[in-house]
């Protein structure tokens, strides 16, 4: 079980990423534009650096919805591999069954 503070930190990062998404995209567009002047591009780089670190989507971590486990999370279910297996064995995930060959 993950600490509550770690779960809360990830929730905070998601909210910050949503808040600054438009501004971040706009600045990155200016930076990657080869027709923009070097001065404008440099200003965009500096502005991008002033944004909060946690507003970057790459700082987010996929966590299990039940336990908060950060590793072995299956995106399709939002659960860790352990919880997916437990739920599948109980028949709680429709269409998912144990492989047999």
From Swiss-Prot:
<keyword id="KW-0687">Ribonucleoprotein</keyword>
<dbReference type="InterPro" id="IPR001209">
    <property type="entry name" value="Ribosomal_uS14"/>
</dbReference>
<comment type="function">
    <text>Binds 16S rRNA, required for the assembly of 30S particles and may also be responsible for determining the conformation of the 16S rRNA at the A site.</text>
</comment>
<dbReference type="Pfam" id="PF00253">
    <property type="entry name" value="Ribosomal_S14"/>
</dbReference>
<keyword id="KW-0694">RNA-binding</keyword>
<dbReference type="GO" id="GO:0006412">
    <property type="term" value="P:translation"/>
</dbReference>
<dbReference type="GO" id="GO:0015935">
    <property type="term" value="C:small ribosomal subunit"/>
</dbReference>
<comment type="subunit">
    <text>Part of the 30S ribosomal subunit. Contacts proteins S3 and S10.</text>
</comment>
<dbReference type="InterPro" id="IPR018271">
    <property type="entry name" value="Ribosomal_uS14_CS"/>
</dbReference>
<comment type="similarity">
    <text>Belongs to the universal ribosomal protein uS14 family.</text>
</comment>
<keyword id="KW-0699">rRNA-binding</keyword>
<keyword id="KW-0689">Ribosomal protein</keyword>
<dbReference type="GO" id="GO:0005737">
    <property type="term" value="C:cytoplasm"/>
</dbReference>
<dbReference type="InterPro" id="IPR023036">
    <property type="entry name" value="Ribosomal_uS14_bac/plastid"/>
</dbReference>
<dbReference type="GO" id="GO:0019843">
    <property type="term" value="F:rRNA binding"/>
</dbReference>
<dbReference type="GO" id="GO:0003735">
    <property type="term" value="F:structural constituent of ribosome"/>
</dbReference>
<protein>
    <recommendedName>
        <fullName>Small ribosomal subunit protein uS14</fullName>
    </recommendedName>
</protein>
């Amino acid at each position: 079980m993950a600490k509550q503070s770690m779960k809360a930190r990830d929730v905070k990062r998601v909210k910050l990423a949503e808040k600054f998404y438009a501004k971040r995209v706009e600045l990155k567009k200016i930076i990657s534009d080869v027709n923009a002047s070097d001065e404008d591009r440099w200003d965009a780089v500096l502005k991008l650096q002033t944004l909060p670190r946690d507003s970057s989507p790459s700082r987010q971590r996929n966590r299990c919805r039940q336990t908060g486990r950060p590793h072995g999370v299956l995106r399709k279910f939002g659960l860790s591999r352990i919880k997916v297996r437990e739920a599948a064995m109980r028949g709680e995930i429709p269409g998912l069954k144990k492989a047999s060959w």
